[in-house]
């Protein structure tokens, strides 16, 4: 009997998840179907309940429903509780298990696919939204020299740092970054989605080995263009993170971790 999974979000027409999970299933010999659901802003819980009633085994969750997915869970993981967001659900009888694989997907892409271990490195995170919340624990676990978070709303970043309470995690401002040096700079703001550049001083890239843009499929965004102009050798967008977090969810559901490299290669667009 074929198992059913789906991604839910709004809008959902842009999603790559059915393609990704279809490739995972084909290469790992798993019998499943994976669809896409345009969620209702007024009745997310009803959408999930209907999918479960039809025999659904699990769901990926994307914007704007990650908080609601977390709230719906009967058993959220530690990562989901910290992020106050879930990007994957698993249904086992009456139990609704929730996970957040965004951070571990980002970490795997940076360390495994891009060959940039974070241990002992100075890392700058631009933004303090859900993706950053999900990344903090996995990043801190590998022992960076420093993890610095900057957000337009400094109070939001400060509250998150206080919540984590880790000595390697600190909060700065865009103005205070002048003259600071980092090994890795990650843009997790929404600026690139609208073709804008976060107000980051150009010299933060002076010693950076990697500039990483969480948005994907946007080509050379203003953030990546600035990094390139400043001589950063390695540029990446978020397609690898997308595939790696999908692989984590697939393994959680199926007990088999699929190969990700062929899928990343298929989806990667030139950064030009």
Which residues are covered by each model-predicted region?
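NAD(P)-binding Rossmann-fold cofactor-contacting core
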Residues: 142-164
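Phosphate-coordination loops involved in phosphoryl transfer and adenosine-cofactor binding
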Residues: 2, 119-122, 207-208
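Helix N-cap at the beta1-alpha1 junction of Rossmann-like dinucleotide-binding domains, i.e.
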Residues: 12-13, 154-155, 218
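Glycine-rich adenosine-cofactor-binding loop
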Residues: 9, 100-103, 110, 114, ...
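Short glycine-rich anion-binding loops that position phosphate/pyrophosphate groups of nucleotides
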Residues: 62-66, 70, 129-131, 190-193, ...
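Rossmann-like adenosine-cofactor binding region
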Residues: 166-235
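Phosphate/diphosphate ligand-binding glycine-rich loop within oxidoreductases
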Residues: 2-114
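Adenosine-phosphate binding glycine-rich loop
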Residues: 120, 214-272
